[in-house]
Amino acid sequence: MALLVPDKGERALLDMMLSDASPNAQNLRLYTAVTGGITESSIETDFTEATFTGYSIKALARATWNAASTATGTTTKTYPQQTWSPTSSQTIVGYYVTENTAGDLLWAEAFASSRALVSGDTLAVTLSIGLD
């Protein structure tokens, strides 16, 4: 599934871009299920967050996003790869990003196929946002 920015995330991202003097950082989270699928009306409480041993929420520092680049009409920013190394088992369906302070959902994406993690695995996620 493609990345989806729900209505709540659209409002928050526009505020961050255009009116927030000091926008809050974001958090990257993994999920095991989402109630009703990812839709325009999704909110953060629809997601069941991962709980495997070794899991942690990844704080996304605003200054760490790579410089924007444009290719074939799409301008993209990426965030350096984030990894998790579980020491217990859990199936991960995708990731979602929340605003750091209020925890509001900004965007979410399901993986092409779920990932059944076991001890010794590494799960890597590289965020990429594009506008065209």
What is each model feature region?
Residues 1-94, 99-132:
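Small cysteine-rich, disulfide-bonded extracellular modules of the LU/uPAR three-finger superfamily
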